Amino acid sequence: LKLMEMNDNHVEYHTVKEFLTFCVDGPDAPGAGTWKSTFPGKYLEGGKEAGGQLVDQRLLPRIDEGEVRILMAGDTCQMAIHKKPLDGLSAVGGNSAYTYYKPTDEKYKKMIETLYKDIPTLLPAMDLQGEPLPLLWTADYIPKNPEGWSKAENADDSETEYVVGEFNCSCVGISKFQ
């Protein structure tokens, strides 16, 4: 397997067995191989109740263009933020250039309207029906070409689709809250 750590963009090569051992028992476990990652692995430790989880998420190559974070207060968008990584693929960890947009800005207005339309289905889909929306939360979108795209160049803005890569209410990055 070719694995990329999205926090610092380093690449490691491991067997499936080494990767699974890392995920279940950690980098120092017998059979895990040698890891450069600073993460402790053991992603399933404690089960769902303790937050143990592993997300199978495909790599979207257009992440190098950045991601769009929609900053929400309850059910109201406060701003859209384009986070463009300065190096590598990942906008994680603050090594990015940030551009801020008002919710009414045409660039992301349709995305925000779609999120508003989808809000009633979000909590039930996450088995949180009946719970209130978080006071402050974000939805991070990653650009992608439409399925079946065969052209050498990427889709233009009018054809680009977006995939939600994360909903977050624990570390929302509000340093530029307006």
Residue ranges and their predicted role:
Residues 2-132, 140-157:
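Phosphate-binding site of ATP-dependent enzymes
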